[in-house]
């Protein structure tokens, strides 16, 4: 009953700081994703980049992308924010400030225990089965009740606490790449093409820098679609 909406757009500290050796970047939550990406390129002299690339990166804030586990053009798990979050700092509902590094706290017996002075707060772990498709809905779960605390926070939309800073992983920026626009006969052909790539790269789709699908509904909003597609069945 009731509640409050908190804006973190003014939380611009700490400053963005890139560690080239560890391929990580410290960031506040109140900067846009585009500002983060540009600063990473600047501090690394174009050698590193932050791969998560949603179409709203000019408007999306770093904290928001973590809260909803935003994803972009990169296929597979590495295209989602969760894959790159190495450390989080957040304020719990009881006012406690905690900093958690990935791998430090793994749930046991289907729950986490947070100590508040002498009080033990038990946080249950969702155990519902997640579908084998791209999915960013709800808190992260595992059928065996064992997950990393960082994964519980990423994508939970702030229900467990308020993010104030983070440490994100970076990737080496490709020096050479080839851009292709492939026109396929229909949606079934597109699925078959994806399956071919999945097998060719031995399930490691991160070897592809970006992969985007333009389906029938999307084409209705495209300019000059007749230049790209011969008929209404092509994708």
Model-based region annotation:
Residues 14-16, 29, 33-34, 38-189, ...:
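FAD-binding subdomain of flavoenzyme oxidoreductases
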Residues 16-22:
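Acidic/polar active-site rim loop that often engages polyanionic ligands
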Residues 1, 53-63, 213-219:
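Short, glycine/charge-rich beta-strand/loop segments that flank catalytic centers
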Residues 204-235:
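Terminal amphipathic helices with adjacent charged low-complexity linkers/tails
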Residues 5-7, 26, 181-183, 210-212:
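Short, conserved beta-strand segments within well-ordered enzyme catalytic domains
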């Amino acid at each position: 009953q009731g509640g409050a909406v908190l804006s973190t757009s003014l939380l611009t500290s700490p400053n963005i700081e890139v560690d080239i050796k560890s391929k990580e970047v410290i960031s506040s939550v109140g900067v846009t994703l585009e500002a983060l990406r540009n600063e990473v390129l600047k501090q690394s002299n174009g050698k590193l980049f932050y791969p998560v690339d949603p179409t709203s990166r000019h408007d999306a804030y770093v904290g928001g992308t973590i809260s909803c586990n935003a994803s972009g053009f990169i296929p597979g798990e590495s295209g989602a924010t969760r894959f790159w979050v190495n450390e989080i700092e957040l304020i719990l509902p009881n006012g406690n400030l905690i900093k958690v590094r990935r791998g430090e706290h793994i749930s046991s017996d289907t729950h986490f225990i947070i100590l508040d002075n002498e009080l033990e707060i038990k946080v249950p772990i969702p155990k519902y089965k997640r579908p084998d498709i791209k999915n960013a809905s709800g808190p992260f779960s595992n059928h065996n009740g064992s997950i990393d605390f960082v994964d519980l926070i990423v994508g939970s939309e702030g229900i467990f606490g308020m993010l104030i800073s983070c440490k994100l992983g970076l990737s080496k920026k490709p020096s050479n790449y080839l851009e292709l626009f492939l026109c396929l006969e229909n949606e079934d052909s597109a699925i078959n093409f994806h399956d071919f790539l999945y097998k060719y790269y031995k399930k490691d789709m991160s070897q592809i820098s970006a992969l985007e699908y333009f389906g029938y509904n999307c084409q209705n909003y495209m300019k000059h679609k007749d230049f790209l597609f011969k008929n209404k069945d092509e994708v």
